[in-house]
Amino acid sequence: MNMCILGTIATGVETLRTRVEYNMERGASKYCSEWKLADTGNNGFVWLGNITDMEGMGAFLTTDEEMKWDKDNGCVYKLYTMSEMSE
């Protein structure tokens, strides 16, 4: 996993899970080979993904449709990139 999204969503984490599944079906899977979504309570979430094309995923997440969906659902988050630590 090389991307972490930490945030909250007013409409609930299951709403976000449904949206992520929808987005994967409509093309985000071209940029993300694996993902996990964890409910941290109080409408908080952590999303982890293995992004294979950062530019493509960035473009996908910043479309007018995605930005409107975030606003309509009260989804506020920060994105972080990660790298694996080895011994």
What are the functions of these language-model segments?
Residues 1-69, 73-87:
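Short S/T/G/P-rich N-terminal loop/turn motif that feeds into the first structured element of a domain
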